[in-house]
Amino acid sequence: MLVLPSPCPQPLAFSSVETMEGPPRRTCRSPEPGPSSSIGSPQASSPPRPNHYLLIDTQGVPYTVLVDEESQREPGASGAPGQKKCYSCPVCSRVFEYMSYLQRHSITHSEVKPFECDICGKAFKRASHLARHHSIHLAGGGRPHGCPLCPRRFRDAGELAQHSRVHSGERPFQCPHCPRRFMEQNTLQKHTRWKHP
């Protein structure tokens, strides 16, 4: 992988190209449609071209990555039909099936919050998060779903359903390693990490 010039001399999150590459890449099952795909192309035998991708480093500075798709494949996998590359985040090593997913994920490592609420000034990394935030400025505080058993109100029906377990005592999330049950899936995940590593 080759890093091309960016607004700063080198992305601050990485000290070298080797540290950007992260763990070894793996090969997935199906071909990825996109700029380097030869599916449905009359030039299926032409050599692959390097592709440019825009990512964002941990300081929010965009930088371009040049990826030669063929050289990034695992040894022995280049001739295997129906296999494609998966992309690994250079910051956290999380693996993605498509480069577009990696690009979307890269904003999570940035401190830049370009979407600002015009009412209160709170800023967000994603437009969808700003849209959800706008509901708090609606009449009633943007919490139309009220609990019938207590005065609490919620933005959406899913939050109300999750809260209702407090009153019902329902614990739908069973630990696969022990008899404990949990009201929320994230609590089960925390339990599993701590008690059953």
UniProtKB/Swiss-Prot annotation:
Broad class of where this protein is predominantly found: nucleus
Gene Ontology biological process terms in this record: regulation of transcription by RNA polymerase II
Compartments where located: Nucleus
InterPro entries recorded: Znf_C2H2_sf, Znf_C2H2_type
Annotated GO CC locations: nucleus
GO MF terms held by the record: DNA-binding transcription factor activity; RNA polymerase II cis-regulatory region sequence-specific DNA binding; zinc ion binding
Bias kind Low complexity: ranges: 35-44
Transmembrane segments: none
SMART domains: ZnF_C2H2
Keyword Nucleus belongs to the record: yes
Pro residues bias: start-end ranges: 1-10
Record's keyword terms, sorted: DNA-binding, Metal-binding, Nucleus, Repeat, Transcription, Transcription regulation, Zinc, Zinc-finger
The keyword Transcription regulation appears for this protein: yes
Chain residue ranges for the region called Disordered: 1-52
Pfam families named in the record: zf-C2H2, zf-C2H2_4
First and last residues of each zinc finger (C2H2-type): 87-109, 115-137, 145-167, 173-196
UniProt cross-references to PANTHER family, sorted A to Z: KRUEPPEL-LIKE TRANSCRIPTION FACTOR, KRUPPEL-LIKE FACTOR 15
Function of the molecule: May be involved in transcriptional regulation.
Name this polypeptide is given: Zinc finger protein 581
Organism whose genome encodes this protein: Homo sapiens (Human)
